[in-house]
């Protein structure tokens, strides 16, 4: 009798999951507008966007990691065109790498919490290495919900993008992506899935259901597309402007010199990938999403994180320490004006570069999409449903 009850219970659970999957798949194609979006003040200056990226770092995913490194700044640049201006925070989780985690933790690593410090995220991304391992999609989704300090703002756009190429049902007895996806939706977090390979194979591996359960979009990419560097006539101009932009940063406090060195390190990392990545990074650095208030005095004063008069002389760079107190604020104001002028020049050159890239990609893509393209498409669709508009 007990055996019969267990069989009936298992059958009921299987049928329920089939029904739930069918219902969610049917709903996946349409992103419904958020009812709160109509209440958004169009004059609101900023609104939060929390973006968590979960990357498979198992042995076959080198192309995915390279795509993420090459295209992070393109994704930032797309969001910089949203209105109201996003207050962007990015978090990074990796899964499937046994040398950097353990079985008890599902082979997952929290690389960064949600942060506005995009250079820190990029530095972590550049340090990633792949090796063989098990890829537990449901577990990665679970940790994305639990590990990150998500915004409590009801008007925040909260997104997860999870990318990989193995069955999404691995270790489902521990964390089933169907239940985790439903919880994410109930918490206002949208889960998008990206399969690295053929779209139909991704469907067989249940990656479309990951997005369906999480209320997001399913995409399949050719990992090689994301690493192609398209050079433009504007790239060298942007690199020259980037050097001038760097000269306007004023490190302060205990984090100042480390922050400045990290910024320069990430310039060098982008340069190693290619001139196109460096140009995209220069555009991102000139946007309002690139905020270094924690270590740069110009950003800190502009965003009211710090006041020059409250800082001790030892907290200031040598160039400012030599100035009388009344001249220090004038020094920061001069740097602010110089930066604003350079940012304007970068924006103008970047607009021409973007048109060149659109034309080049239309001719060369062959219908295949890269990582940044599918992420940007989903981001824009879901941001518009939340009340954002794009230039």
Where are each of the predicted segments found?
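Alpha-helical, heptad-rich or low-complexity scaffold/stalk segments
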Residues: 53, 326-327, 331
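Bacterial N-terminal signal peptides that target proteins for export
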Residues: 1-12
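A general alpha-helix detector
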Residues: 315-316, 327
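Eukaryote-biased recognition of electropositive, low-complexity segments
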Residues: 177-181, 187-189, 200-303
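Divalent cation-coordinating acidic motifs and surrounding scaffolds
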Residues: 27-226, 232-235, 303-313, 319-321, ...
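Bacterial N-terminal signal peptides
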Residues: 10-23
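Nucleic-acid enzyme cleavage-core boundary/entry regions
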Residues: 2, 22-28
């Amino acid at each position: 009798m007990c055996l019969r009850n267990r069989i009936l219970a298992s059958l009921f659970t299987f049928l329920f999951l089939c029904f739930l999957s069918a219902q969610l798949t049917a709903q996946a194609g349409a992103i419904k507008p958020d009812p709160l979006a109509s209440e958004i003040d169009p004059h609101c200056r900023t609104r939060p966007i929390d973006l968590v990226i979960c990357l498979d770092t198992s042995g076959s995913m080198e192309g995915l990691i390279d795509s993420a490194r090459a295209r992070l700044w393109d994704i930032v640049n797309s969001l910089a065109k949203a209105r109201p201006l996003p207050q962007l925070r990015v978090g990074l989780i990796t899964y499937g790498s046994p040398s950097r985690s353990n079985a008890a933790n599902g082979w997952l690593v929290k690389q960064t919490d949600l942060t506005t410090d995009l250079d820190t995220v990029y530095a972590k991304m550049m340090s990633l290495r792949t090796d063989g391992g098990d890829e537990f999609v449901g577990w990665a989704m679970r940790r994305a919900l639990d590990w990150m300090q998500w915004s409590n703002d009801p008007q925040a756009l909260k997104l997860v993008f999870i990318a990989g190429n193995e069955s999404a049902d691995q270790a489902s007895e521990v964390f089933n992506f169907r239940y985790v996806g439903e919880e994410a939706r109930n918490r206002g977090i949208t889960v998008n899935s990206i399969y690295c390979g053929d779209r139909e194979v991704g469907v067989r591996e249940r990656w479309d259901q990951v997005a369906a359960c999480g209320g997001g979009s399913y995409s399949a990419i050719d990992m090689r597309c994301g690493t192609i560097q398209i050079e433009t006539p504007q790239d060298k101009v942007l690199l020259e402007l980037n050097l001038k932009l760097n000269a306007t940063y004023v490190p302060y406090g205990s984090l100042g010199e480390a922050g400045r060195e990290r910024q320069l390190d990430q310039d060098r990392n982008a340069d190693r990938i290619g001139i196109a990545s460096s140009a995209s990074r220069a555009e991102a650095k000139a946007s309002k999403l690139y905020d270094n208030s924690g270590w740069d005095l110009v950003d800190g004063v502009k965003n009211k994180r710090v006041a020059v008069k409250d800082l001790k002389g030892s907290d200031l760079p040598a160039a400012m320490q030599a100035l009388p107190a009344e001249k220090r604020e004038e020094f920061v104001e001069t740097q602010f004006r110089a930066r604003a002028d350079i940012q304007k020049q970068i924006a103008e050159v970047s607009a021409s570069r973007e048109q060149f890239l659109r034309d080049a990609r239309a001719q060369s893509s062959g219908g295949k999409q890269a990582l940044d393209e599918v992420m940007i498409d989903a981001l824009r669709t879901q941001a518009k449903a939340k009340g954002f508009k794009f230039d």
